[in-house]
Amino acid sequence: MYKLILVTLDGTACDRALIEHVKLLAKQAQSRLVLLHVADGWAARIYGADAVSPEITEDTAYLRRVQAEFNGAGIPAEIQLAYGSPPEEILKAAEALKCDLIAMAGHGHRLFGDIFHGSTITQVRHRTLIPLLLVRAKKE
């Protein structure tokens, strides 16, 4: 049913709940994964794939660690680092890859950002026809 799952990661502790859910689902469904992080700092937004910054180096290392975790569990995963607006890049990747499911973690609300821009989850869910798995991050 879910042959290819796009797993959106933001590099925060909120990712852990999503990773654990996706591990179970991917094993049961024998899914392949694409682990996506959207770098949205100033360097990423201005220079895109040409950006060189500590943020992008850390993002790539994080994606590789998560990839190794999934691969170690017998789940094929590849990584993709995108640059710019998270909702836009998530939607573009999901459509280009023809994903069967988009998996995202919710962190709750960031008042001012949500008021002015809307949350990433809200924007994605209103604009995609691809099924979504939304996992609420556990409070620490």
Residue ranges and their predicted role:
Residues 1-17, 126-140:
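Intrinsically disordered or low-complexity boundary/linker segments at protein termini
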Residues 37-38, 105-107, 136-137:
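Short secondary-structure boundary segments
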Residues 36, 78-82, 133:
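General small-molecule cofactor/ligand-binding pocket signal
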Residues 68-102, 139-140:
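Structural beta-alpha unit
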Residues 52-64:
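Short, surface-exposed alpha-helical segments at coil->helix boundaries
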Residues 51-54, 96-98, 120-122:
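Short, hinge-like loop/turn segments at secondary-structure boundaries
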Residues 105-126:
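Glycine-rich, Arg-bearing micro-motifs that act as flexible, cationic patches
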Residues 3-49:
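Small/aliphatic-rich secondary-structure junction motif
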